[in-house]
From Swiss-Prot:
InterPro entries: Cytochr_b6-f_cplx_su8_sf, Cytochrome_b6-f_cplx_su8. Belongs to the PetN family. The lineage of its organism: Bacteria, Bacillati, Cyanobacteriota, Cyanophyceae, Nostocales. One of its GO terms (molecular function) is electron transporter, transferring electrons within cytochrome b6/f complex of photosystem II activity. This is Cytochrome b6-f complex subunit 8. The 4 large subunits of the cytochrome b6-f complex are cytochrome b6, subunit IV (17 kDa polypeptide, PetD), cytochrome f and the Rieske protein, while the 4 small subunits are PetG, PetL, PetM and PetN. The complex functions as a dimer. One of its GO terms (biological process) is photosynthesis. NCBIfam families: PRK14747.1. The gene is petN.
Length: 29
């Protein structure tokens, strides 16, 4: 169960980071 939770957390972090990169890229940062 811990591995499954870790997988979901890591997936969420990667997804959030990707969205942040796109937003910052559009803002010219």
């Amino acid at each position: 169960m811990a591995i499954l939770t870790l997988g979901w957390v890591s997936l969420l972090v990667v997804f959030t980071w990707s969205i942040a990169m796109v937003v910052w890229g559009r803002n010219g940062l």
